[in-house]
Amino acid sequence: MAAVMSRRALACLFAAARPRGGAPFASPRDAPLRWLSSAAKDLPARDPRLFCVVGSGPAGMYAADRLLTHYGASARVDILDKSPVPFGLVRSGVAPDHASTKSVVNRFEGVLSDPRVCFFGNAALGRDVSVDDLTPRYHAVVLAYGATGDRTLDVPGEDTLRGAISARRFVGWFNGDPEAHGDDVEISLHGAKNLSLHDEITACLTQHRDVSHEPCTHDDTAKDRSKREMLSNGDPTEIEKKPATAEAPTAVIFGLGNVALDCARILLRDARDLRETDICAAALATLERSEVKKVALIGRRGVAQAAFSPKELRELLNLPDVDVRVYDDEVTEADEADLEASRPRRRAREAIEKRKARGNDENEIENVEIESGTRRKNRKELSVRFLRSPSALVARDDDATRLGSVILEMNELRGPPGSRRAVGTGATETIRNVALALRSVGYRSKPLEEHFIVKSTHEPDRFKQSVPFDAARGVVPNAFGRVTHSVAPAMGGGEWQVPGLYVVGWLKRGPRGIIGDNLIDAEETVGALVADDARGMLRKPDYRFKDRGVAPLLEARKKSTVSKEGWRRIDAEERRRGAEAGKPREKITSVLEMLRVANEGG
């Protein structure tokens, strides 16, 4: 259920609230809900419109673009972002070897370059300004700050063991996110000293592992055990046949979406192939020294329900020098119905079948190394394991703070086609010698936390507004992008619209879809805003702020922000550093350094 406003809040807002009457509207998209305030004024279309977009990722940039397109010369858009640099997950969430996906930045740069747009980087909603600060300064505020949290596995060891992190943070690490690399950002994990996420991931990927931690799975036959006994006794014949990856540590990735595939691909591909991409230099250095040679992708349901897209799956399955093993990808009659209903899933299954048919060329030896009379192949291994759920993350025998193995429960699917659910069977298997476990089971938006209280000077008795949040769905409740609030039955009940407040992107619909989906989403939200404007239902900015937006407030609070000119200086410096290294850019990984570069000459 959506959050319910307190009686005190309603008492302040209800005094002037009036449900709007009039002729019926053509569709629910155009029909305004009941309003929580009488702030709306009749605004002639020729008057300037001041808008604030909170978040400069794809959703925010598309929303700004649509506002500029619709309102033309009368629009002014201020864009706020907690990061010093714009473009959100296009910068920090797209894999470095997918440069074509990042080309959308060219369009977003055009939006930023528009003289009607101002950018305020390093200005966080809830930390530096509040919703209560913004709404009286603009005709409308569009929330586009996305999903900054993660869904969890809810298993023992997930929150306590070093080496267990979210895929979101891992992606941020190889993309140079300051939260992973900055010298001003530290983490503390289960008794470990404070260290950056980069240091933690480096320790996971490059630490020495003992052969006693060799992986063991449910198909660990007596013959396999016998071979290991011969290996331990030094049988040269069996050493000759031993796979190169037998002693290598494993990375386990929970989830079968495209983010999981990105993480697996970065871990498995030859790191030298990434040198000419915009991957963070520190992350590249770690990957080049990585001891991880095996990656296990774990999915709780079957191949017919997996979320990955065919193109990304084919790319992963066909990496050079990577053996592929697939477990429990058989399909039932009910699975066939799921496949029939989804062309992408059919194509994904075909990609798996084609890769299995090709097999692994055990005779192919790349980068042969002669050492003590044995041959070792410089190959890696990908295993895709369907119908498994994590049961526990277990510490190493020699280090109670560090991840050592993963226990999985085998699943079976129940239910009709289209709603098949995974149910545990009680049977388990263990993957040992696990250096890194990434959870990639979905992003999640968080409720806005306002860490300070600023007494309103323009309306001393006004209720301090926050952003409603539907914790069950992980979104800001809305109707076609109009932010709504559930009102207690004693106060009239129903869904009421919060005046002048709109939402777009993952914060609006949940964390799903591709970058292009945000354009459609932004068009819907801006369409609702325009419809409200046509009926005189936008806010009128308080005249005491002189149509200057949030800039004077940030200046008064002595907040060091990054303008679009400052961003251009950061961009130029990153490109300069990249050119020296033969790559598109070398991202700056410290907020403090970003601010220094942005303010040079400014």
Kindly give the residue locations of the regions a language model identified.
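Feature captures the FAD/FMN-dependent oxidoreductase FAD-binding
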Residues: 108-160, 391-405
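Beta1/beta-strand and adjacent pyrophosphate-binding region of the FAD-binding site
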Residues: 46-57, 247-257
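C-terminal, flexible cofactor-proximal segment of oxidoreductases
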Residues: 486-490, 496-602
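Glycine-rich dinucleotide-binding loop and its adjacent helix/turn
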Residues: 150-289, 471-489
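N-terminal Rossmann-like FAD-binding beta1-loop-alpha1 element of flavoenzymes
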Residues: 50-73, 260-267
